[in-house]
C-alpha cells in the first residue's frame, strides 16, 4: 500500500513540475539556471521515499567558475539524491532518447540541457566540441556521468573519456560529486530507507594534463571518487547502525 501511495504522489508531482516548469521556461527557454531550480524540486521527493539526503560541498562552491562536474550514476534515484547539489548555472549532458519521455523530455530540453546521440560517434564527438564552445561563450558548467550508464549495484564502472577530453580542451577544472550507494537500499514498501550522503569534492586542476593524457586524468578522477564513495558508505553504515541518521 505504501508503494502505491508513493508511486501515485511521485507521478502527480513529477507531471505538475514538468508541465508548469515547461510553461515557466518558455519565458526564458534554454536558460541554464533552470536546471538547478528544477533539479532541486525533484530533490524534494527524497523524504517521500523515506530518504534523508545530506549534501556537503566546499564553502566556496557557489563561486566556482566554469567547470565539468562528474558524478557516479547508480539508478533513477539519482534524480532525488544527486540533483540536490547541482549548482547554477549547470547543465547536464544526456542521451537524445530522453526527449521522448512524456512531459520530462520537454522540460529537459527547455531547461538548457545538452543532448548526445550515442549511436552516432561522429555526432557524439560533435557534442564534446559543443561543450567546449559553450565554455568559451559564457559562464556555464556541465554535469556528466562518466560511466555512461547506470551502475545498478555493480560499483563504480569504468569511465568513458568524453568529460575529460572536454575539460582538457576547454581548460576548465573537473569537480567530482560522490553519492553514497543507493542500490538495493530503497524499499518503497518500507517507511524509512535511511541516509544518503552527496559530497562535492574540491576542483581538480587539469592544466597539467595534455591531450594525450586523457585516460590518465580519467583514472585519477575515478580513483579519487572510488575512495570517497567507500568512505561515505562506511559512514552511512556506522550512522545507521547507531541510529544517528
Swiss-Prot record:
Question: SMART domains, per this entry?
Answer: PlsC
Look up the EC number in the record and give it: 2.3.1.51, 2.3.1.n4
Q: Which residues are recorded with the post-translational modification N-formylmethionine?
A: 1
Q: What class of enzyme is it?
A: transferase
Pathway annotation from the record? Phospholipid metabolism; CDP-diacylglycerol biosynthesis; CDP-diacylglycerol from sn-glycerol 3-phosphate: step 2/3
Query: Is Nucleotidyltransferase tagged as a keyword?
Result: no
Q: Which GO terms describe its biological process?
A: CDP-diacylglycerol biosynthetic process; phosphatidic acid biosynthetic process
Please state what the annotation says regarding this protein's domains: The HXXXXD motif is essential for acyltransferase activity and may constitute the binding site for the phosphate moiety of the glycerol-3-phosphate.
Its biological purpose is as follows: Converts lysophosphatidic acid (LPA) into phosphatidic acid by incorporating an acyl moiety at the 2 position. This enzyme can utilize either acyl-CoA or acyl-ACP as the fatty acyl donor.
What family does the Swiss-Prot or TrEMBL record give for this protein? Answer: Belongs to the 1-acyl-sn-glycerol-3-phosphate acyltransferase family.
The protein's name = 1-acyl-sn-glycerol-3-phosphate acyltransferase
Amino acid at each position: 500500500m505504501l508503494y502505491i501511495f508513493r508511486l501515485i504522489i511521485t507521478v502527480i508531482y513529477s507531471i505538475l513540475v514538468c508541465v508548469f516548469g515547461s510553461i515557466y521556461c518558455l519565458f526564458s527557454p534554454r536558460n541554464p539556471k533552470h536546471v538547478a531550480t528544477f533539479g532541486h524540486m525533484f530533490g524534494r521527493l527524497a523524504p517521500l521515499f523515506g530518504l534523508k539526503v545530506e549534501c556537503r560541498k566546499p564553502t566556496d562552491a557557489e563561486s566556482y567558475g566554469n567547470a565539468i562536474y562528474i558524478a557516479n550514476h547508480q539508478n533513477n534515484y539519482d534524480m532525488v539524491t544527486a540533483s540536490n547539489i547541482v549548482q547554477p548555472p549547470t547543465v547536464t549532458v544526456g542521451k537524445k532518447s530522453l526527449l521522448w519521455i512524456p512531459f520530462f523530455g520537454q522540460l529537459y530540453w527547455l531547461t538548457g540541457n545538452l543532448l548526445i546521440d550515442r549511436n552516432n560517434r561522429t555526432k557524439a564527438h560533435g557534442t564534446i566540441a559543443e561543450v567546449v564552445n559553450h565554455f568559451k561563450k559564457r559562464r556555464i558548467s556541465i554535469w556528466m556521468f562518466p560511466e555512461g550508464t547506470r551502475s545498478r549495484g555493480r560499483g563504480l564502472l569504468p569511465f568513458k573519456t568524453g568529460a575529460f577530453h572536454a575539460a582538457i580542451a576547454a581548460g576548465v577544472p573537473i569537480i567530482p560529486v560522490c553519492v553514497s550507494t543507493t542500490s538495493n537500499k530503497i524499499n518503497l514498501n518500507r517507511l524509512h530507507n535511511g541516509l544518503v550522503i552527496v559530497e562535492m569534492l574540491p576542483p581538480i586542476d587539469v592544466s597539467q594534463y595534455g591531450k594525450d593524457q586523457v585516460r590518465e586524468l580519467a583514472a585519477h578522477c575515478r580513483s579519487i571518487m572510488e575512495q570517497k564513495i567507500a568512505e561515505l558508505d562506511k559512514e552511512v553504515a556506522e550512522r545507521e547502525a547507531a541510529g544517528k541518521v
